[in-house]
C-alpha cells in the first residue's frame, strides 16, 4: 500500500523507464489517442439520427458516470504501477494477467484495420493534388464513345471509391487480388508509423505536437468557411434541433454509452502505457477530466464544422433537384428560359397541376424537400470517402479543401495509431520476453513489420468487407469485458481503500464520494448493461453486409447479404478469442499453484519418510 508521505518503493527509486519531456507532450498524446476518426465521422451522425440536441443528454450522462471514471482508473493505475497493460494486471493479481493479454490482442487487431483506413485516406490525399479532382467526372468506356455505365448509374464519387479505389468484389467469398496501389499505400503508412514510434515516447512525443494540433487548425478553417456557405445554417439547425421523443428509444442510450466508451479509447491499454511514463506525483485526476472533456468538446466542434458543409451540400442538391423539375416544366409547356425561379416553382407547379393535370402527371418530376437531402448523411468511411468528398466537389477551390480534409484525417488517425502501438509494444517490452540485447528500434521494426504482413489481406478486392468485420467484431465485446474486469480488478481485488491511498499519495487528495460510487456501483452496472444489450443485438440480427454489386436490380443501392458460415465463425472468433485470455490465464495460474503445492507436499512427505527411515 502506498503511504501518504515519504518514500514509496515502487516509484521513488530512480529507474530506467522513459519519461515524458513535459506535461504537454503527455496530454497531447492522450488527446491524440482519444480524439480519432470516430469524432469526425460517427458522433455527428449519431447526434443527427438520434434526436439532434436531445442526444447530448444521454451522451453527457454516459460521459460523467461511465467515461471519466473508467478513464481515471486507467490513468491512475498506469501511473501508480509504472507498467504497461500486461504488467499492471499481473501486479494487481496473477489471475488477472489475461486482461492485459486481451487488451494487447485487441490493440494488435485494431492496429491492423485502423492503419488500413489510413491507407485509404492517404490514397485520397495523394489524388487531391489534381485539378479537377479525379472523382469529379466519370471515365470514358472502352470504346471512348461514352462514360462507363457503372459510374453513370452510381455517381462519380461512389464509383471512384468502390471501383477505382477498392475495386471491390460483389461478394465476400470472392477474395479477388491484391490492389497494388493500396499495397504501396499500406507500405507508406506502416513506414510512417514505424518512424514515429521507433523510440517510443521519445519519438512520438516530438511528432505529437503536429499530429494532435493540426486537426484543430483544419477544423477551424472548415468551420469558418462552412459557416459562410449557403445552407450552412439549415444544416446546423437540422443537426441540433432536439427531438426529445428519441430518448424513449433504448438504442439511443446504448449508442451514447458506446460512443463515449470507444471515443475515449478505453481498455485498449494505450492510456495505461502513456500514464506509466508520468512522474509518480502527477495529478492524474485533473488529467482524466481535462482529456475527457477535450475529447467530447472536439466531437461537438467537429459536428458543427462537418454539418455546416453538409448543409451546403444538401442545399446544393435541393437546388439542383428543383432546377431539373423546372427544366421539365419549361420544356413541356414551351415556357421562356429562366421564366420560373426556384422560389416561384411551388406556386407554378400548383397552378399547372390544377389546369394541366394530365400533362404534369406524365412528367418525371422528383419530390424535392431540403430535409430529405439533409437526411442523406452517413457514418464511418461512407461519410469521409463519399458524402463529404462529394460536398467538397461543389466548394470553390475543391482541391485545396480536399487536401486539407484528408490531411486532417491522416494526422488524426496517425496520432490514434501511436496509442494503439503503445498498447502493443509497451507490454511486450515490459514482459521481458524479447531478447534484451536487441535494440528497441529493431524490435519496434519487427513488430510493425508483423502488423504490416498481417494487414495485407485488407488490400485484396474483398478487403473492404473484411475491414467492416474487424471493425464490428474485433473490439466491441472484448473491450466492454476488459473494462468491466478493470473496474472489478482495481476496486474489488486491488482494493478500494488501497487504490484511494495510492491516489492520495500521487495527487495529495483522496477521491471523493462521486468517484467511489461510480467506481463501485454505477460504472460496472452501465458496462454490464451495455454488454447485455450487445449480446441481445447479436442474437436478434444475424451478421450481414452490404455488397457493391453492379448487377443488383436496385443498384446503386448496395445488396444486403448474409455472411457465409465460415465468415460467421470468423466473426464469433474475433468477438470472443481475445476475451478467452482472461479465464485461460486464471486457469493456468490456478493449475500452476496447485502443481507447486503438490510438489511441495510430496517433497515434504519425502523428507519425512527419509527422516523416519534414518531413525
Swiss-Prot record:
Tissues expressing this chain: Expressed predominantly in kidney.
Keywords in alphabetical order: Amino-acid transport, Cell membrane, Glycoprotein, Membrane, Neurotransmitter transport, Symport, Transmembrane, Transmembrane helix, Transport
Phenotypic effect of disruption: Animals lacking this protein exhibit no gross abnormalities and grow to adulthood, although they do exhibit hypertension. The elevated blood pressure appears to be attributable to a decreased level of renal glycine. High-affinity renal reabsorption of glycine is eliminated and intrarenal glycine concentration is reduced.
Phenotype upon changing residue 50 to Y: No effect on protein abundance. No effect on cell surface localization. Increases alanine uptake activity
Keyword Glycoprotein: yes
Biological role stated in the UniProt entry: Symporter that transports one amino acid molecule together with two sodium and one chloride ions in kidneys and plays a role in the neutral amino acids reabsorption. Preferentially transports neutral amino acids such as L-glycine and L-alanine but also other neutral amino acids. Required CLTRN for cell surface expression and for its amino acid transporter activity. The transport mechanism is pH-independent.
PANTHER family per the UniProt record, alphabetical: INACTIVE SODIUM-DEPENDENT NEUTRAL AMINO ACID TRANSPORTER B(0)AT3 (PTHR11616:SF109), SODIUM/CHLORIDE DEPENDENT TRANSPORTER (PTHR11616)
Protein name (Swiss-Prot/TrEMBL): Sodium-dependent neutral amino acid transporter B(0)AT3
Organism name: Mus musculus (Mouse)
Gene that this polypeptide is encoded by: Slc6a18
Amino acid at each position: 500500500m502506498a503511504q501518504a508521505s515519504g518514500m514509496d518503493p515502487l516509484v521513488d527509486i530512480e529507474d530506467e523507464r522513459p519519461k515524458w519531456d513535459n506535461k504537454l507532450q503527455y496530454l497531447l498524446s492522450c488527446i491524440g489517442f482519444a480524439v480519432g476518426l470516430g469524432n469526425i465521422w460517427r458522433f455527428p451522425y449519431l447526434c443527427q439520427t438520434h434526436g439532434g440536441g436531445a442526444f447530448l443528454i444521454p451522451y453527457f450522462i454516459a460521459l460523467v458516470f461511465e467515461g471519466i471514471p473508467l478513464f481515471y482508473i486507467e490513468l491512475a493505475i498506469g501511473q501508480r504501477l509504472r507498467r504497461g497493460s500486461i504488467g499492471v494486471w499481473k501486479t494487481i493479481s496473477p489471475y488477472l494477467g489475461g486482461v492485459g493479454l486481451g487488451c494487447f490482442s485487441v490493440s494488435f487487431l485494431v492496429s491492423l484495420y485502423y492503419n488500413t483506413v489510413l491507407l485509404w485516406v492517404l490514397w485520397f490525399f495523394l489524388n487531391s493534388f489534381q485539378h479537377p479532382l479525379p472523382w469529379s467526372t466519370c471515365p470514358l468506356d472502352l470504346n471512348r464513345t461514352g462514360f462507363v455505365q457503372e459510374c453513370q448509374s452510381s455517381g462519380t464519387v461512389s464509383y471512384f471509391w468502390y471501383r477505382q479505389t477498392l475495386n471491390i468484389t460483389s461478394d465476400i467469398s470472392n477474395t479477388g487480388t491484391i490492389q497494388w496501389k493500396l499495397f504501396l499505400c499500406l507500405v507508406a503508412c506502416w513506414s510512417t508509423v514505424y518512424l514515429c514510434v521507433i523510440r517510443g515516447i521519445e519519438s512520438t512525443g516530438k511528432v505529437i505536437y503536429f499530429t494532435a494540433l493540426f486537426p484543430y487548425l483544419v477544423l477551424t478553417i472548415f468551420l469558418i468557411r462552412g459557416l459562410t456557405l449557403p445552407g450552412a445554417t439549415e444544416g446546423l439547425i437540422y443537426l441540433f434541433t432536439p427531438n426529445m421523443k428519441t430518448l424513449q428509444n433504448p438504442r439511443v442510450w446504448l449508442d451514447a454509452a458506446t460512443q463515449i466508451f470507444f471515443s475515449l479509447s478505453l481498455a485498449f491499454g494505450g492510456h495505461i502505457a502513456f500514464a506509466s511514463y508520468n512522474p509518480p506525483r502527477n495529478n492524474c485526476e485533473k488529467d482524466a477530466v481535462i482529456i475527457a472533456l477535450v475529447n467530447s468538446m472536439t466531437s461537438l466542434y467537429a459536428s458543427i464544422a462537418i454539418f455546416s458543409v453538409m448543409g451546403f451540400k444538401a442545399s446544393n442538391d435541393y437546388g439542383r433537384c428543383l432546377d431539373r423539375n423546372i427544366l421539365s416544366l419549361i420544356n413541356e409547356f414551351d415556357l421562356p428560359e429562366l421564366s420560373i425561379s426556384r422560389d416561384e416553382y411551388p406556386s407554378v407547379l400548383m397552378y399547372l397541376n390544377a389546369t394541366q393535370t394530365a400533362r404534369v402527371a406524365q412528367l418525371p418530376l422528383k419530390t424535392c424537400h431540403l430535409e430529405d437531402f439533409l437526411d442523406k448523411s452517413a457514418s464511418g468511411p461512407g461519410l469521409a470517402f463519399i458524402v463529404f468528398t462529394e460536398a467538397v466537389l461543389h466548394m470553390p477551390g475543391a482541391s485545396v479543401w480536399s487536401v486539407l480534409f484528408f490531411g486532417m484525417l491522416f494526422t488524426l488517425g496517425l496520432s490514434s495509431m501511436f496509442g494503439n502501438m503503445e498498447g502493443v509494444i509497451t507490454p511486450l517490452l515490459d514482459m521481458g520476453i524479447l531478447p534484451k540485447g536487441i535494440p528497441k528500434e529493431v524490435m519496434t521494426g519487427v513488430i510493425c513489420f508483423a502488423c504490416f504482413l498481417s494487414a495485407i489481406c485488407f488490400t485484396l478486392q474483398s478487403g473492404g468487407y473484411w475491414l467492416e468485420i474487424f471493425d464490428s467484431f474485433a473490439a466491441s465485446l472484448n473491450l466492454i469485458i476488459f473494462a468491466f474486469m478493470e473496474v472489478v480488478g482495481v476496486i474489488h481485488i486491488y482494493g478500494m481503500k488501497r487504490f484511494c491511498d495510492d491516489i492520495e499519495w500521487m495527487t495529495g487528495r483522496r477521491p471523493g464520494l462521486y468517484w467511489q460510487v461510480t467506481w463501485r456501483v454505477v460504472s460496472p452496472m452501465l458496462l454490464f448493461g451495455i454488454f447485455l444489450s450487445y449480446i441481445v443485438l447479436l442474437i436478434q440480427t444475424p451478421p450481414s453486409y452490404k455488397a457493391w454489386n453492379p448487377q443488383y436490380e436496385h443498384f446503386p443501392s448496395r445488396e444486403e447479404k448474409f455472411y457465409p458460415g465460415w465468415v460467421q465463425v470468423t466473426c464469433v472468433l474475433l468477438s470472443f478469442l481475445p476475451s478467452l485470455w482472461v479465464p485461460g490465464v486464471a486457469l493456468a495460474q490456478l493449475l500452476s499453484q496447485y502443481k507447486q503445492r503438490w510438489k511441495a507436499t510430496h517433497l515434504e512427505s519425502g523428507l519425512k519418510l527419509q527422516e523416519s527411515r534414518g531413525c
